[in-house]
Amino acid sequence: MSVAVPFAPSPTGLLHVGNVRLALVNWLFARKAGGNFLVRLDDTDEERSKPEYAEGIERDLTWLGLTWDRFARESDRYGATDEVAAALKASGRLYPCYETPEELNLKRASLSSQGRPPIYDRAALRLGDADRARLEAEGRKPHWRFKLEHTPVEWTDLVRGPVHFEGSALSDPVLIAEDGRPLYTLTSVVDDADLAITHVIRGEDHLANTAVQIQIFEAVGGAVPVFAHLPLLTDATGQGLSKRLGSLSVASLREEEGIEPMALASLLAKLGTSDAIEPRLTLDELVAEFDIAKVSRATPKFDPEELLRLNARILHLLPFERVAGELAASVWMMPTPAFWEAVPNLSRVAEARDWWAVTHAPVARRRTIPLFLAEAATLLPKEPWDLSTWGTWTGAVKAKTGRKGKDLFLPLRRALTGRDHGGQLKNLLPLIGRTRAHKRLAGETA
């Protein structure tokens, strides 16, 4: 059977790096196995699911290059879920409950005060037909719980190894809400069974949920997939990530921070693994290096500063053709390959705007003009200029003035760029050009 893995985000907020890490790991796993990657929107929360968030999920995955083989919405498959729910009701595995949210909160508080886990007491199973009729006559509508078997649930996790849960330590989950809407715990099982999902790779916050869903798979006669539970990412301080607050959202990293997609992918693919984090220019490279067995159970931290450093390393490796579009959006004239080669190490493509100004915009006139610069101006070679011009010219200036080292180069840099530091002048000088260089050496605004 061909490997098939789902990424099932909820369109209730912006994707953050933790969500996208799961998407990337699923995608890498599928591609390494020659299988299929499915995107399935968990839009069962109708109140909080928004079209703009669904569109954002597609935009983020496309930006990263995580192509999918199938795209689905759980809300489109309620018909299939209704059939399964009816069968579970008929078999007695789904039973109606009538407690209000307030009553359930009181039960949980009572259990907590006794130091006991919040496990549902199955009071609804003790209701007779007359009791249910009376409650419904009062206007109460049932929600439906799945009756768990009080037997051990075990599986071999691809990340955590052998996992064991006692069924008696789990609470019967609500699978159908009071308004008749099927919830994620049921819809995801039905979809996984219908779509022949072979592996489910998700966060470790789903461990108890997996134990529950294994029993649901068995109850509906579906093949139980292989599970893998990854440790959840935290920020650099160890705090959890929240997509609803926009914390470290992919959209923000792309649109506000200027992060390259392969910088983010290179980092997220290796966080929490035994591999060194190195810049990669293609997803194919990450696929070749991927092995889920390398994922550690330790909690990985996402450091934006580490991402920015990796972004700079990625930019240093990218050819002009890969950045031409971004460069054109950052500067006010069409850039050239020579300009891209000339700019110093950038953390973001947008920083090229600053260096475009150095080579093409006026540098402010200085109040005093050292005689040395006037002499240097007279020694400027004729054009055309190339990468050897800087060395030829400064050699002539050194021979004429006797200056060397910092006394030679720093005044020239300040006059030509208005800065003390920056890219190699052998690259920048041909972009500045002879006319502009002569004026700047003469102290003119040029």
Curated annotation (Swiss-Prot):
Main localization of the protein described in the UniProt heading: cytoplasm
Description of how the protein assembles with itself and partners: Monomer.
GO terms under cellular component: cytoplasm
BP GO terms, sorted: glutamyl-tRNA aminoacylation
PROSITE patterns, per the entry: AA_TRNA_LIGASE_I
Function recorded in the entry: Catalyzes the attachment of glutamate to tRNA(Glu) in a two-step reaction: glutamate is first activated by ATP to form Glu-AMP and then transferred to the acceptor end of tRNA(Glu).
Keywords: Aminoacyl-tRNA synthetase, ATP-binding, Cytoplasm, Ligase, Nucleotide-binding, Protein biosynthesis
Subcellular location: Cytoplasm
Pfam families reported for this sequence: Anticodon_2, tRNA-synt_1c
Residues of the signal peptide: none
Binding-site residues for ATP, renumbered to this chain: 243
Motif ('KMSKS' region): 240-244
Enzyme Commission identifier(s): 6.1.1.17
Locus of motif 'HIGH' region: 9-19
GO molecular function: ATP binding; glutamate-tRNA ligase activity; tRNA binding; zinc ion binding
UniProt gene name: gltX
Name under which the protein is recorded: Glutamate--tRNA ligase
Lineage, opening ranks: Bacteria, Pseudomonadati, Pseudomonadota, Alphaproteobacteria, Rhodospirillales
Protein family membership: Belongs to the class-I aminoacyl-tRNA synthetase family. Glutamate--tRNA ligase type 1 subfamily.
Catalyzed chemical reaction(s): tRNA(Glu) + L-glutamate + ATP = L-glutamyl-tRNA(Glu) + AMP + diphosphate
